[in-house]
Amino acid sequence: MRKYFAAVLLLLVSASLVLSIQKSGEWIKYTSPEGRYSVSLPAQPKLTMQEATAADGQKFPQYLASVIEPGDVAFTIGYFDSVPGTIFSAQAARDGIVKRINGTLISESAISLSGYPGREFKILMKPARARPADATYVVRARLYEADKRVYLLQFIFPQSLESDALAAKAVKYFDSFQLGELSPM
């Protein structure tokens, strides 16, 4: 009887471990009604807002949804509405990002989403507070402008973790991004 009980207990524990492993790999579909987008993420994002300043000094809000996984793997979606009287430049935005993070642009290409123009780029960066001090991070990003709203998706990870599995995770994330109710420009 003890052997039977032990076998059943082992089977139940094994089954629960398998189920918990499967659930930890499931992604959620996050929808932002205010941001007018949806995206798949590995967990519910943390939402924040910060004030930014345009080149002409005008202040405007930027909204951010982010998920950080163990190992410093981060998924971020930011958006803001273009400041009235300004013209958005994807190239200037890219250059500003590279400069702000003291990074090196590795690659870039033109992309589009639902007819809206965009840029995809990859940057290598060494954060000021990186541990160890020689840690290098990879920033894969997609930038879109749609109906005077700018979206920036980023997938950030330590370069030491670069792998096919992580690349597949980035593709899953980026390819899941969808715009809500917008009309083509």
Predicted feature descriptions by range:
Residues S40-S66, R94-A146:
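Signature of long, low-cysteine stretches enriched in small and polar/charged residues
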